[in-house]
Amino acid sequence: PAGAAACNIVEASSEKAYVSLQGIGVVMVFNPTTMTKIADIDLNNLKQSDTRVAPAAMIIRDGKLFVGLNQMNAQYMPTRNNIELAMIDVKTDKVEKHIVNTTLGLCFATRPIDPGSIFMDENKDIYINCIGSFGFIPGLNGGIVRIKNGSTDIDPDYYIRLDKTEVVGLTTKYANFLSTIFYADNGKAYAYANSFGLDPDGLKNPYVSLTNIPVVIDLKQKTVAVIKGMEISNPQGIAIGRHKNLIVFGSANKKANGFYTYNPDTKEVVGPVVQVKGNPSFFHSFEK
């Protein structure tokens, strides 16, 4: 539909998938085999009084679709520290719950262009990357929260707030938000942390400034640390993926545009192993 701004797809089966349409507040249900529409799930009644609701990244667990909800004003910004999701039953395609947390001091659940901003670990705990206000509005904060296995509420006792969590090895000490995140295993996630203080023009020209630095996140210990030897990228060249036992980072930095590898076991950084023109914004390996 016009103005839909489709951003994320999750597949329930060969006959049913969901696409979030952030521009019109709808999750569309469709058949991914025949590519025919099944239904629209309208979420606009979940909007706040001063914002519109934009469904973003999604994940399915135990027959329930969890949809990150971005509440945005006319400037595409949140107005309060609410973490919100919609929970939809995959069998009926009905909204069963509007999940809201107002106590953890975070907002903007999931990033629409980053499917990894909502993920599940080996324990089937769901983790959500909250973008906050992209670092533009003090007090509207970014970080990570979770929904534990067996629960449909945001865990009130677990969070990583970036305004309160010092990033080990980061010269500016604190990150504004996690631009993209990739869960590996054993409670370890890899991300690009955005800190506008890394570039003198960070806030003046946020789309091309060098403000994104690779970090490793220990979800169990709730720590964030810079990966030593990695370059600082602009916010467009921030791919993260895995190839065999290596974590692969796309980076558009002062020295090169290309892909770098990080070995979690040896901590070795190599690269660029491949150089590209433009911004290395996506990576996928077909190796098991």
Task: State where each predicted segment sits.
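Solenoidal tandem-repeat scaffolds enriched in leucines and small polar residues
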Residues: 46-109, 113, 122
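Surface-exposed loop and turn segments in beta-propeller and other repeat-based domains
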Residues: 1, 40-51, 95-113, 153-176, ...
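Short, conserved, GDST-rich strand-edge loop motifs in beta-rich repeat architectures
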Residues: 67-82, 127-143, 191-209
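Structural signature of eukaryotic scaffold interfaces centered on beta-propeller domains
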Residues: 8-12, 54-61, 114-123, 174-186, ...
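Asp-box/WD-like beta-propeller blade repeats and closely related beta-sheet repeat scaffolds
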Residues: 1-16, 20-28, 32-57
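Entry beta-strands of beta-propeller and related beta-repeat scaffolds
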Residues: 16-17, 64-67, 124-128, 187-191, ...
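Loop/turn-rich, solvent-exposed surfaces of beta-rich toroidal or solenoidal domains
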Residues: 174-251
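Beta-propeller blade signature
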Residues: 31, 79-93, 140-152, 207-219, ...
